[in-house]
């Protein structure tokens, strides 16, 4: 079983995360930001990851530190994963009504994000849409994953939810075990 626990305790956030990469999509997520809980739940469900996440953040200031630090701990959990025999690459194109999200991933040890997300609104509930790209940057830098994404659509809820669903599907694909693979790199290491 590829299961990991990560804690982060700073002056801004206190986070406890449990991740089972080989899960069934069970989740219990409490960040204090209802829409963020919703899209993280979509990530877990569509990625078939069991995810337990308890966060106490400085939301009296804003949601930036909470979103950023969740990206950090989730990234660290995936970075802990043994890279031998994984498929390494994953991708997904997910529609949600008028919105469409495309995500492609390389778990190759080289953190880099190319994201095309232009919000139409500043907020979805108490969630700041400017934090969407920052979440993925925080995740990528800590997971050491190359991540590309593009989102189109009109409804902000649909756009961000489609993006997190596509993220889950692509991560599920990339983390799948294929015994034929060994280390998927001509270098011999990831």
UniProtKB/Swiss-Prot annotation:
Pathway: Amino-acid biosynthesis; L-histidine biosynthesis; L-histidine from 5-phospho-alpha-D-ribose 1-diphosphate: step 6/9. The keyword Amino-acid biosynthesis applies. It is found in: Cytoplasm. It catalyses: D-erythro-1-(imidazol-4-yl)glycerol 3-phosphate = 3-(imidazol-4-yl)-2-oxopropyl phosphate + H2O. Its main location: cytoplasm. The keyword Secreted does not apply. One of its GO terms (cellular component) is cytoplasm. Keywords: Amino-acid biosynthesis, Cytoplasm, Histidine biosynthesis, Lyase. One of its GO terms (molecular function) is imidazoleglycerol-phosphate dehydratase activity. It holds the Pfam family IGPD. Belongs to the imidazoleglycerol-phosphate dehydratase family. This is Imidazoleglycerol-phosphate dehydratase. It comes from Methanococcus maripaludis (strain DSM 14266 / JCM 13030 / NBRC 101832 / S2 / LL).
